[in-house]
Amino acid sequence: ELMGIVVKPGSAHGVENLNIEERVAKIIDAGCDMLGGETLPDIIVELVKSGKISEERINISIKRILKEKFKLGLFDNPYLKTENISILGNEKFMEKGRESQRRSLVLLKNENNILPLKEGSKVYLQGFNKDETKKFANVSTSLKDAEAIILKLNTPYESNSEYLIEKFFHQGRLDFPEKKKAELLKLIKTKPTITVINLERPAVFPEINEKSKAVIGDFCSQDNIILDLIFGKFKPTGKLPFELPSSMEAVLNQKEDLPYDSKDPLYSFGFGLTYEE
């Protein structure tokens, strides 16, 4: 007997020629228990009434679903003991989360050991929380007066929405559009720049990397955690969980089912620096 529940992904995927009733009947006949991303009880009721799907078949799926819900305790007493509130968001757990963020940060480049910066340095910000940065440095609104730039970037993506799933995820090209790249390079060339890039996907940024004095790979860490690293409150220990490609050409030419095979990656899988003593 099947253990668990069979759930289908969203969209028609190859049966776009069938109407909605035919699709649902085909899905259920294939052994599916839940329609992922859909709420179609009226369609299922009509299929049973018309005899296209038997009530016995529906009961099999209902049994599987309810069994898992009972296992999870979803039908038990929904009221928690008030003393259990102390478990949620307690300081010990919060510190575990902060430590995970610290350990995830990857120092990719540190030219002439520019990092860590000295506290009280004059910095120009782009993408960072100003109030958090003021705890470490003098934040300048003028590039001319700044000693360094601290720049935060996100991995590029394309805003395609032809398919439903694309609306929920960043996808498409991994390199910066030429206009945006030119703007960033113009900024970076004015002062020594510490570039922090959020690597939700493996970004392609060789020119920005070359012109930056320091580069940090970030995985959605809080600004104060990143600033702790920049100003030497802890040493970086993170390693890249994937390689960073050197070009979009390398991305397009690599094999989709073979890891770490892009040509001349900018940074290899597992790369990561730390501060010198």
What kind of region is each of these model predictions?
Residues 2-20, 41-55, 67, 95-277:
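C-terminal non-catalytic regions of proteins with extracellular/luminal or membrane-system context
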Residues 26, 47, 86-90, 169:
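A short, mixed-charge helix-start or loop-turn motif at secondary-structure junctions
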Residues 53-70, 75-81:
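Terminal amphipathic helices with adjacent charged low-complexity linkers/tails
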Residues 74-96:
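Long, charged amphipathic helices and adjacent flexible linkers at domain junctions
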Residues 23, 28-35, 41:
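Mobile "lid/hinge" segments at catalytic clefts and subdomain interfaces of large enzymes
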Residues 28, 49, 70:
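Short polybasic/polar patches that bind polyanions
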